[in-house]
Amino acid sequence: MVEYKPSPAPVTDLREALLDRVFAALSDATRRELVHRLAERECTVTELAAPFAMSLAAVSKHIAVLEKAGLVRRRKDGRTHYCSLKPEALTGALDWIAIYQQFWRQRFDALADVLKD
């Protein structure tokens, strides 16, 4: 019997997939607020859920999306789950944004030059 071994995905495909997950995770206002709060300090899931008008299970699902995107690390101590931000996961998104930031900066500078004349 022939065994099928898929070839590993090229590194660029993996980077693109991770970038897609990061932007998808950050597309939701609740998840952006969770990231904002975790940027300040490590929190329990219960602490993270407190300000939201949703169930603990719903907040936990949002956290799972952030985990899948590599933005959040969850650790367990007894029955308590602690979450912390993994800021290095934002590097790819920041690099992507920087490309377009430079692009638009150049465009606006060119426009400013045209308007001066």
Feature-to-residue mapping (PLM):
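Short, hydrophobic-biased segments on the C-terminal half of alpha helices
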Residues: 63-64
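Beta-hairpin "wing" of winged helix-turn-helix
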Residues: 67-78, 82-84
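Amphipathic alpha-helical dimerization/coiled-coil segments
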Residues: 1-18, 36, 91-117
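N-terminal helix-turn-helix DNA-binding core of bacterial DNA-binding proteins
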Residues: 2, 17-57, 80-95
